[in-house]
Amino acid sequence: MSQSVKRTAADKPLAPCPICGKPARTETKPFCSPRCADIDLGRWLGERYVIPGPEEDEMSYPPHSNDGNRSR
């Protein structure tokens, strides 16, 4: 008798790490290590990655006064 092997999501190979290209690990998915995850986070925090949004017209903001008085 032949035994059939059921494949699960855990058996599916993960995509390569987006930072270094090594195979990703489940524990740090989609990265291969905490180091690569930290590199990616640093890039987001350093604004090297951005998500584009709609252009904003300068006229859509209220006028700004530089006279030093604050309205309360």
Swiss-Prot record:
According to the record, cofactor stoichiometry and binding are noted as:
Binds 1 zinc ion.
A molecular function (GO) held by this record is:
zinc ion binding
- For this UniProt record, give its keywords in alphabetical order, as a comma-separated list: Metal-binding, Zinc
**Key word Cytoplasm present in the record?**
no
> Where do the segments described as Disordered lie?
52-72
Annotated binding of Zn(2+), by residue: 17, 20, 32, 36
Complex formation: Interacts with GyrB.
Function noted in UniProt: Inhibits all the catalytic activities of DNA gyrase by preventing its interaction with DNA. Acts by binding directly to the C-terminal domain of GyrB, which probably disrupts DNA binding by the gyrase.
Family statement drawn from the similarity comment of this UniProt entry: Belongs to the DNA gyrase inhibitor YacG family.
Q: What is this protein called?
A: DNA gyrase inhibitor YacG
- Organism expressing this protein natively: Methylorubrum extorquens (strain CM4 / NCIMB 13688)
Upper classification of the organism: Bacteria, Pseudomonadati, Pseudomonadota, Alphaproteobacteria, Hyphomicrobiales
Could you tell me the gene encoding this protein? yacG
